[in-house]
Amino acid sequence: MLIRAYSCMLLAILFWSLNPVANKIALEDIAVPQLVSMRAVFSSIILLIISYVIGYRYSPKKIGWKPFALGVLDPGLTSLIFVTALTVLSASNTVLILALMPFSQSILGRVVFKEDFRSSVWFGAVLAVFGLFIFFSGEQFFEADSLWGNGLMMICFCLFSVSQLLTRKIMRAEIPAIQVTSSQMISASVVLILYLIIFGDMELPLQASSGTLMTFVYLVFSMALPFFFYNQAMRHIPVGMASLFLVLIIPLGFLFAAILLGEDITWIKTAGAILVMIGVALPHLLESGKRKFSLMQK
């Protein structure tokens, strides 16, 4: 069961690593309101079809209101803020900030779920913050666009932190993961369609190349499937451990950004990213070493 849970988590990480790059490509031809709303609508339709095919009867009354509330937060608000930030930031910037999730999750997991808290998290946090400082020293951080984009990403980071805890709490109940994910997408669709109606240009024609349309098709599935994989994994993996996997977004995200977008990943940025990865992974590695040493002593 744990192997299946970790496999689901790795699949979710793979999708999330490629998403910033795919969003950057789609934004060349599709405006933010249209992109985020269409993704959510088509994703919810796909998930409802899958749920029906595999034999689940969708019943909002049985599911309850919590998955719908979670969907408003994530992927509703988070996808909107994330894609908006991508209009002014590079793809590599976004994956680095999101990889800091384990620190917030270790603290919040301890407060909410009474999960074990390792003091080594603080040492790892210092390394990660130092790595961020090095990373951002390689760009014009105090430019207006950079400040705006990174500010949005920090808001997105906070929303992701809260949503992970809510997901963990919801998935402790006996609700099928596919129905939780479908409910998330439905409520996210409502929020994002309202945003499109109020702030978007409804008369803006969709003139996208075949490559952009193929990217959009990928983005539809990559919005639905990672949340399903993630929700499935969260039944068996603690919050702190689950968020630790997000460190893999850094090397994968950098690789995709360099290959598909031609982003310049300088040595300064690489050094900063490596420090962040070490800082994020170090608490878990130290804890694993202590456990192995204790077993050897016995």
Regions found by a protein language model. Give the residues of each.
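Helix-helix packing/entry segments at the starts of transmembrane helices
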Residues: 36-38, 75, 79, 94-100, ...
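Hydrophobic/small/kink-forming positions within alpha-helical transmembrane segments
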Residues: 17, 21, 48, 72-76, ...
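C-terminal transmembrane-helix exit sites in multi-pass transporters
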Residues: 46-58, 82, 101-126, 251-270
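Hydrophobic alpha-helical transmembrane segments of multi-pass integral membrane proteins
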Residues: 3-8, 34-49, 69, 124-130, ...
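Hydrophobic transmembrane alpha-helices of multi-pass small-molecule transport proteins
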Residues: 47, 117-139, 192, 247-248, ...
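Membrane-interface helix termini and inter-helical loops of multi-pass transporters
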Residues: 21-32, 87, 136-146, 197-211, ...
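Specific transmembrane alpha-helical segments of multi-pass solute transporters/efflux pumps
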Residues: 15, 19-20, 51-98, 134, ...
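Glycine-/small-residue-enriched transmembrane alpha-helix faces in small-molecule transporters
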Residues: 1-34, 143-169, 190, 293-298
